[in-house]
Amino acid sequence: MFASKNFHNQSAFCCDKMSQFKCPSSLIIAGPSQCGKTTFTRQLLQQADSLFERSIREILYCYGQWQECFKDIAPRVAFVEGIPEDIPSLFPPNCRPGILILDDLMRNCSDDERILDLFTNVSHHCDVTCIYLTQNLFPPGKFS
C-alpha cells in the first residue's frame, strides 16, 4: 500500500490484493498533535472499499473532541462521543465486518479494561477492525 496522487491531485491510497487489510485487524496510529492522524484515518475510511479485503458494513467513530473534518465522512460513519458501554452490541452479525475508531480517547482508555478486551476478544469474535489514534503510544495506566 502506498500513497499517490489521483486525478484531482489529491492523495489516494493504491493497493493490490496483497496489501489489503484483513478483517478483522488492529491498527494503532500514533503521533503528535496536528500531525495528520485524523486526516489519514479519514482518507482510509473514504477508500475502505478498496483497502479492506471484504466490504465494510458498519463504521463507528468514537471521539473525544468533535472536529469539523468529521463532516466529510459523516454519511457513511456513525459518530459517538466517548466510549460506548456495550461495544459488541453495536456490531450485530448483519453489520459485520465493521470498523471501530477510537480517536483522542487515551485519557479514557488507559484505565479501561474494556479496551484491552476490545483489541483481543471483541475484535476477533465480532469481526471488527479496531483503529486507535493516540498521541502517546505508551500512556501510563493500569491496562496499558
Question: Predicted segments — roles?
Answer:
Residues M1-M18, W66:
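N-terminal pre-Walker A segment at the start of P-loop NTPase domains
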Residues A3-F7, V77-G82:
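Intrinsically disordered, low-complexity eukaryotic regions enriched in glycine, serine
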Residues N6-S11, I59, T134-N136:
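Short, functional N-terminal and low-complexity linear motifs
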Residues P24:
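Short coil/loop residues immediately preceding or within conserved phosphate-binding loops
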Residues L27-D49, R54-R57, G64-E68, A78-S144:
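Conserved P-loop NTPase motor cores
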